[in-house]
Amino acid sequence: MKPPDKGLLLSSYVDFTIPSPFAREHLYYLIQYRRYQCVPGYEVERDFLDMYLCAYVRSGSLHTFCGEQSANATAGQLVLMDCRLPHRYYVTEPTEFLWFHFSGGESAAYVRLLTGGTGICFDGNHEILQYFEQIFYYGDKQVYNEHRISVCIQSVLCCLAVPDTKPDIPEVIRPAVEYIAEHFREDVTLETLAD
């Protein structure tokens, strides 16, 4: 189905799913998903929509506002929004992004956890993009599989909760951390670490 929104190129598409009663009660479920290619003039503004939005920017930038938070997501970044709050997003340059609306499972708790500390914009990675592609694949009417969709949505949220980065370890304690990692099966004393 072609979207009617201003600023969308004809190559954009929209698709919807109708989750089963089981999915609505027990799974993360997909409501609609889209690949948008848009130009300046594209804008969405709503006071309330009873679902959550996850968008992955492939090129350009997506300017977003949700509740009291705002972000400018650029290529390779992802936006996660609670659409039950007033929200707005728009582009100021040619932009391509993949996005889906979802709900169910522990969506509200996960979105609160993820956006409460770091905001609504996250760095994406190749793994997250693969989950988006799988969500779109399993959302297709020919292969529709709401159980796999649920796993993929949860996997995206999991990737955001546990980023693919290791914390910087201060140089002063790095030798102790490395020693513990190498000798974790042994009794390690504070005196040994101090040496």
Show the residue positions of the predicted features:
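Ligand-binding loop in jelly-roll beta-barrel domains
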Residues: 70, 83-107
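Short, conserved beta-strand segments within well-ordered enzyme catalytic domains
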Residues: 55-57, 63, 79-80, 98-101
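An amphipathic alpha-helical interaction segment
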Residues: 98-109, 121-185, 189
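ATP/adenylate-binding site constellation spanning eukaryotic-like Ser/Thr protein kinases
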Residues: 59, 94, 173
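Residues that scaffold the ATP/ADP-binding catalytic core of kinase and kinase-like folds
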Residues: 65, 109-111
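Append "Primarily bacterial transcriptional regulators
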Residues: 76, 80, 191-195
